[in-house]
Design a protein with these regions (language model features):
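Juxtamembrane regions of bacterial inner-membrane/periplasmic proteins
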Residues: 1-244
């Protein structure tokens, strides 16, 4: 029994030490730009493991040198309550939960009506804020477990405590994936439009923002009807997006 308690204590201590390490890294980001993220390193290893060339395009640019159109487009598309929440948008999570439950119920009904007919899996929505996405990409693995989601919540709150909204958005826009080996706003602007992130037009910014949930897929499908339609929607919402 003592051995079991000792083992549990060691695991708890290791978990606490890891979280403290993450928090210290976040605090340092108030003045230091992260050289890479956990997600980026994972992508690099995947490319190397496939014996292909390492594709990595990224160039850090200060917040002031990123088009206001892109900032507004990303907020409008990914997290319209960004400036007001404290890292986690509970209302968005509740809405996502309801949509997912409704979609799963519809799938269950379809399977009951035609059990031998294949049914397309529902699209799962997460309701993650920009801060949560940054916490996940910066520091966490890609696994989908309740423990990792809990870590994401804790780290999102830490990001909001130690960093300003402007700094969070700056780090996010400089590190988010925008295609195969394309990371950050500057690399994306040059890859897709042959211009600096500072000079993106509203339509270009909206299109880049719409790509974010599935950048590799949309990179291969530039003529996607969904991409075009969603771009028009985000263009209409950009004027109401509040910047930090």
């Amino acid at each position: 029994m003592k051995a079991l308690l000792r083992w549990i204590g060691l695991v708890a201590f290791a978990a606490l030490a890891l979280e403290l390490f993450f928090v210290l890294r976040i605090a340092a980001m108030a003045v230091l730009n992260p050289e890479s993220t956990t997600f980026q390193r994972s992508e690099a290893w995947a490319q190397l493991a496939s014996d292909g060339p390492l594709r990595w395009r990224q160039q850090w640019v200060p917040y002031a040198q990123i088009s206001g159109h892109l900032k507004r487009a990303v907020i409008a598309s990914e997290d319209d309550g960004f400036v007001n929440h404290e890292g986690v948008d509970w209302n968005a999570i509740e809405k996502a939960w309801e949509r997912n439950a409704k979609a799963e119920a519809q799938i269950a009904k379809a399977q009951a009506r035609a059990p031998d007919k294949p049914v397309r899996a529902p699209k799962i929505r997460g309701g993650s804020t920009i801060t949560q996405q940054l916490a996940k990409n910066l520091l966490l693995s890609g696994e989908r477990t309740l423990l990792r989601k809990g870590q994401e919540f804790v780290l999102a709150l830490a990001l909001e405590q130690f960093l300003s909204k402007e700094r969070i958005l700056e780090i996010y826009l400089n590190n988010v994936e925008w295609g195969n080996g394309v990371f950050g706003a500057e690399a994306a602007a040059r890859h897709y439009y042959r211009k600096s992130a500072a000079n993106l037009a509203p339509h270009e910014a909206a299109r880049l923002a719409v790509m974010l949930p599935a950048p590799k897929r949309f990179e291969k499908m530039p003529n996607s009807a969904y991409l075009s339609g969603r771009t028009r929607t985000i263009l209409g919402r950009m004027g109401g997006a509040e910047l930090p």
